[in-house]
Amino acid sequence: MKIVAPAGNMERFYSAISATADEIYLGLKGFGARRNAENFTVEELKKAIDYAHLRGSRIFLTLNTIMTNREIELLYPTLKELYNYGLDAIIVQDLGYAEYLHKNFPSIEIHGSTQMTVANHYEINYLKELGFKRIVLPRELSFEEIKEIRENTDMELEIFVSGSLCISFSGNCYMSSFIGGRSGNRGMCAQPCRKEYKTSCGEKSYFLSPKDQLYGFDEIKKLQEIGVESIKVEGRMKDVSYVYETVSYFRSLINGIDKEENTHKLFNRGYSKGYFYNNDKAIMNRDYSYNMGEKIGEVLGKNIRLDEDIVSGDGVTFVSKDYKNLGGTYIGKINVVNVKEDRKIAYKNEKLILNFPEGTKYIFRKIGRA
């Protein structure tokens, strides 16, 4: 089983390679489903191809949006240059563009994006006839649905195992376009589903905001057993630490080591198993829609009782009882109740002396941003 990792820029690319990613997906500036990512110039992409190939990894270019005639014509000389340079695969959403690529660059691998919403083996086998090599299945499929597809096709399958979930099917959502004039199907989603809304009865909540997906040891083992070729880490908009820690986490799971030690410190909106087992309200997070990280303490009187160790230099966020973000700070000098000596660390179950905003109930620590 291979790990397909994201890279939003060169720094994150190096991080993915260091974490032993087998395949890296990345985008050109101005194209693909993550236009707001930093992305790559042609020269940077060629540099990445060289670096990856020397280390036994492969590079996939994301052109996974609806394409216009002008964009197809504009991209031709760039793709020809990258094709001749050794680009391994192109990830697409647009069927017409896939046909164009197959005719003009016959030896390039064509992968079907999750944006295509290919949810049955009949369509997958049809796409194979059209020259597709691999399909990235929708996040919205359960394990039983994935298993049925695997039993009825020999197409390479790629499964998302971490990252953001969409309130709609990816590639079929018009909410951002309707509300803010930014099409999620053209790489410019404004994520209005992450906003707080109010019902006609006055109740406020993040009604449309799903938790982030994170598969564990059992889920990866099940996917290995049915013969899924690749697992995919979401995150071209995520930072270096997120890419490195998440890829390392899945490498451990593939190697049979069950661990989750750093995942709750990374960017997340709370975790769920997504649609792997079922589709119910456990997928949703109505309390907050932003990165919280790892809960490490709770206000007890005038101090904070620690649920985890905390170290000088850690960044923390203060959160109210209804999970409103009240701001954050970096931990400087460590002051612990009934402890006089200077320390760089406070331990689990100790009471930390720390100024915090009025209304604070919890403190969270995070090491990843987006």
Where are these regions (language model features)?
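Surface-exposed amphipathic alpha-helical tracts and adjacent flexible/coil segments at the periphery
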Residues: 1-19, 23-33, 49, 55-83, ...
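Beta/alpha (TIM)-barrel catalytic core signal, keyed to glycine-rich beta->alpha loops juxtaposed to Asp/Glu
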Residues: 117
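Glycine-rich, positively charged N-terminal anion/phosphate-binding segment
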Residues: 34-51
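Conserved nucleotide-cofactor-binding alpha/beta core module
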Residues: 121-122
